[in-house]
UniProtKB/Swiss-Prot annotation:
Pfam families: F-box, FBA_1
Cited PANTHER family: BNACNNG10540D PROTEIN, F-BOX PROTEIN CPR30-LIKE
Kelch repeats: 98-149, 155-205
Protein name per UniProt: Putative F-box/kelch-repeat protein At3g16880
Alphabetized Gene3D superfamilies for the sequence: 1.20.1280.50
SUPFAM superfamilies: F-box domain
PROSITE patterns noted in UniProt: FBOX
InterPro entries tied to this protein: F-box-assoc_dom_typ1, F-box-assoc_interact_dom, F-box-like_dom_sf, F-box_dom, SCF_F-box_component
Tree of life domain: Eukaryota
Amino acid sequence: MTKMSKLPNDLLEEILSRSPLYSMRAIRLTCKKWNTLAKEESFTKKQLVQTKAAKEFMVIMMMDSKFCLMNINLNKEEDVEPSIKCNGKIINPIGMCRVYHCGGLVCITKSFSNTRDVVWNPYLGQTRWIKPRSHHAYIYAIGYETKKSCRSYKILSSEHNYINIDDERVDYEIYELDSNSWRALDVNSNWATAFYKMDVSVKGNSYTYTDYRGDFLISFDFTTERFGPTLPLPFHSRCGDIVALSSVREEKLAVLLHRCNISRMEIWITNKIEPNNVSWGKLFLTVDMKPLIIDDGIFFIDEEKKVVVVFDKDKEMRNRITAYIIGENGYFRKVDLGDSESFPVRCSYVPSSVEIKQLAKGKSN
């Protein structure tokens, strides 16, 4: 019998790429050869193909101070129920409560009075702790610009300074992972209150919904390091409506609208999205559904299967989190995720082999 260590690389890659994502740390630690193989772009692509073939996609969620990598199986066959599997705690989240994802990297941070943030690649198991220049800085987004076919990752933060009750100044800074350094950003923005909402990254840039002084999207371009013009939504919301954003495999933007006075949820997906331009497709899905309890509107989309997963507090037992899996022609399933006193914090996750450069011991920003 041929030993695994003696197998040719192409066959070994084919076998190991079929392993679930949460097994990758054990695979990388097995030997130096496997660790090198797991970092290859071809290996990552094969694993993504296997994940898609298994009719699953991945999300990262924090429930009751535990970050979990969840596999969501959206099989719509009549004899196979959809499932959501939590693969256990994957990072120490003490004091962390906000999650941002872009291009395979995840930034986890506190909301306010921040002392440290962490950038993390769950696929490679790499992390870097980042110390903000101010304890009152607030992480707004993570994104990247492309330089000579390579991605240069950056983090945008803001610090809100209240001069008086009617006057607020917002200072912005950019952190570059490549240089491990912060620098001041000379930009102006009138959308300070919007930054308390969760942003969504698409193609390396950031998008946030705001109902402050209007009803639209705000973009930040990580290449020009500038805010773009306001971008229209495919609807006009009213006071009390729930509006939420999600990305579709980081290639498209999706928006959810749940009217406060009627039991109907509507979802649209972009045809085109850029920091300076957006084009919305026709209505993607309409569902008759009772109003959501969690006003963040946590949802994910599988565009190919035309299925939406919405996370919310259970309507009858408010201490439990429920995933509602919704599709066309009245398709509706519920998956109980268990007890959670806090609202879940989440982001979708697409694996990437992008490495986080490790700093020399004792070196910090």
